[in-house]
A protein has these predicted regions:
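Catalytic-core "active-site belt" of small-molecule-metabolizing enzymes
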Residues: 2-231, 256, 268-274
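Short strand-turn-strand beta-turns centered on an Asx-Gly dipeptide
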Residues: 196-198, 242, 262
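Conserved metal-binding segment of the jelly-roll/cupin
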Residues: 234-246, 251
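A short, acidic, flexible beta-alpha connecting loop/helix-capping segment that sits on the rim
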Residues: 246, 263-265
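Conserved, well-ordered active-site substructure
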Residues: 253-263
Length: 275
């Protein structure tokens, strides 16, 4: 029986697929015993290989925090992946279309993002945790699937960059000691409408994010990171995207996607896509 591929070998395979803009069979198809601990070891190998070729970690994406989509994908718990300087687009660069031609089976997710202003810890309460957030913003993550038809197991998603393709962050709103308590309340239970070329495509509510809103996703991430000796701890200056507020919908070059937010003091966002 051949030896199971090493984390570095699997990392090379998924990075080759990423660079070649092609899809591959899920890791679990050839290795049914490939589990989440093994997948996060691959994720660490991917990070090291991406850093070796000049990319820099600038944040994290948390996926599958929206419980309403779990059955659709057969994944029933959150996962996370790194965000890189090559995949992040800040508000200062949102005036031009976002290229997606290098992504495979891309889908769009409206999300809430936080900027880390002080190092948070997993045992903090909501007040302490929000005090570590420098800003909050609304934006889009473009996710992708190296696996045809979006068919995979949870471990496959972790090995393949957490399905991350690109992160477009809207204009940040500072969180201050005077506004932190209000943000805790306002980020739970607000509504979002997702539109394609002006037509409503889906609706969501922030309470779908782990039942407690975006801050709950950050807390979950902190608990997972604390249990993983290979994972980099969250650092000041990182961006954390907390998971989709609606279903993840397929996108194509030439489309313009936008959102309307209600009951939260954040603007909607418009994002044009190009090849």
């Amino acid at each position: 029986m051949p030896a199971a591929p090493t984390p570095d070998a699997i990392a090379e395979t998924v990075l080759s697929a990423l660079t070649g803009v092609r899809q591959i069979a899920p890791v679990t198809a050839a290795a049914p015993g490939f589990d989440l601990p093994a997948a996060y070891r691959v994720a660490d190998a991917v990070r090291r290989q991406r850093e070796a070729r000049g990319e820099r970690v600038v944040g994290r994406k948390i996926g599958f925090t929206n419980r309403t989509i779990w059955d659709e994908y057969g994944v029933h718990a959150p996962m996370w992946g790194y965000v890189y300087d090559t995949t992040l687009r800040s508000a200062d660069h949102l005036g031009r279309p976002l290229p997606i031609g290098h992504l495979v089976e891309p889908r769009i997710e409206p999300e809430i993002m936080f900027g880390i202003g002080a190092v948070p810890h997993k045992d903090m309460d909501d007040d302490e945790l929000m005090a570590c957030m420098a800003w909050v913003a609304h934006g889009f993550e473009i996710v992708q699937s190296l696996f045809p038809g979006w068919k995979f197991r949870a471990a496959d998603t972790v090995a393949a960059f957490g399905l991350h393709g690109a992160l477009a962050v809207g204009r940040p709103t500072p969180i201050t000691p005077a506004t932190a308590a209000d943000w805790i309340e306002r980020l739970v239970g607000f509504d979002v409408t997702l539109l394609r070329n002006g037509l409503e495509m889906d609706h969501g509510n922030s309470v779908h994010v782990l039942g407690g809103g975006p801050l709950s996703a950050v807390r979950h991430l902190l608990h997972v990171l604390a249990e993983d000796p290979d994972a980099l701890p969250l650092a000041v200056g990182e961006v954390v995207s907390t998971g989709t507020l609606t279903r993840a919908l397929p996108v194509a070059p030439g489309e313009t996607w936008s959102t309307r937010l209600e009951d939260v003091p954040l603007p909607g966002m418009t994002l044009a896509l190009t090849r």
